[in-house]
């Protein structure tokens, strides 16, 4: 799965998330503020993600983000809905659920690319 960040206003980080079946959805994150906890998007890179069964929103959790914990992919429509997480529309989360939710023990790969 690939999250391609695109040129964005200074108050947010916009992106396009492409699922394995080729479907694309817009994403929204906080702006880049040097990976500061709760106020910055996470660095570009390769991450594992898994079904989230204990977090606040319980959709998906991005794992092993250097210097950060509790990074989730969840529903949201504006940067203030995030504390460093990746916000996605409900239709995307449902598509991800149908693709990735079958096995609690599996992890998957998310590649985040900067513009």
Regions found by a protein language model. Name each.
Residues 1-115:
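Cell wall/extracellular polymer interaction/catalysis modules
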């Amino acid at each position: 799965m690939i999250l391609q960040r695109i040129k964005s206003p200074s108050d947010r980080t916009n992106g396009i998330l492409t699922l394995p079946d080729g479907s694309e959805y817009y994403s929204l994150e906080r702006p880049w503020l040097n990976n500061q906890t709760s106020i910055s998007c996470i660095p570009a890179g390769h991450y594992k993600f898994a079904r989230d069964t204990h977090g606040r929103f319980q959709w998906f959790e991005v794992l092993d983000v250097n210097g950060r914990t509790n990074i989730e992919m969840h529903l949201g429509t504006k940067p203030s809905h995030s504390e460093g997480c990746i916000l996605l529309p409900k239709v995307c989360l449902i598509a991800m659920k149908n693709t990735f939710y079958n096995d609690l023990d599996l992890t998957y790969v998310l590649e985040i690319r900067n513009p």
